[in-house]
């Protein structure tokens, strides 16, 4: 608000207003360039193992970290800000299956977060509405990368026919869905990314991920 600039000189006021407008333009045109991960986020993005996890409570930033990481892998290197390029592991076309507990979570959390972060010019057609196929729940990027969205409510028998670079889970999936996802990235030497709040106590993820983990296979933050 400009009334908060009262007391500044005309020159200083103009500089602040110009900087604010420049920030607004950048937020609209290239929001990912304004994503600067905190220390734990930098550690998470730097993991290169076949399984990695961002675990934390509500508002801890785990969804932001995982979806930003998905975008880092999906975009062409030229479209990434320089401070995020060191975290790029895959080259386009990057094929990623993103899963959540329900379509409500996909629509209200995942889609919203991706729209906040993705530079519109990197999407097919230059905007979300053109790039997102509602019928197939697929997001298309201009460089050929794709995000395929499914939920844990979907029957396992309908999860076939996909071979990709990554499966990204928002909240802990049922074990059967995780096993299916793990199988789907094997052919392309892909990875799995988890973002979850440990609210159910010691579940399969403790026995299946934490307990037997090795530095070569799993890293969590």
Regions found by a protein language model. Give the residues of each.
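Phosphate/NTP-binding elements of NTP-utilizing enzymes
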Residues: 1-221
């Amino acid at each position: 608000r400009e009334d908060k600039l009262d007391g500044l000189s005309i020159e200083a006021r103009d500089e602040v207003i110009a900087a604010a407008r420049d920030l607004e333009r950048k937020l609209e045109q290239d929001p990912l360039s304004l994503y600067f991960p905190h220390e734990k986020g930098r550690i998470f993005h730097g993991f290169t193992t076949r399984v990695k996890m961002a675990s934390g409570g509500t508002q801890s930033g785990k969804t932001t970290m995982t979806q930003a990481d998905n975008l880092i892998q999906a975009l062409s290197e030229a479209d990434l800000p320089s401070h995020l390029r060191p975290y790029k592991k895959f080259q386009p076309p990057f094929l990623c299956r993103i899963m959540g507990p329900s379509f409500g979570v996909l629509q209200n959390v995942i889609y919203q977060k991706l729209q906040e972060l993705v530079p519109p010019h990197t999407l097919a057609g230059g905007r979300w509405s053109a790039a997102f196929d509602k019928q197939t729940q697929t997001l298309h990027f201009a460089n050929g990368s794709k995000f395929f969205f499914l939920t844990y409510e979907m029957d396992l028998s309908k999860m076939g026919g996909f071979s990709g670079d990554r499966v990204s889970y928002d909240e802990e999936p049922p074990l059967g869905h995780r096993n299916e996802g793990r199988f789907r990235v094997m052919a392309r030497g892909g990875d799995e990314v988890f973002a979850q709040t440990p609210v159910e106590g010691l579940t399969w993820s403790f026995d299946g991920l934490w307990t037997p983990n090795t530095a070569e296979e799993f890293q969590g933050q």
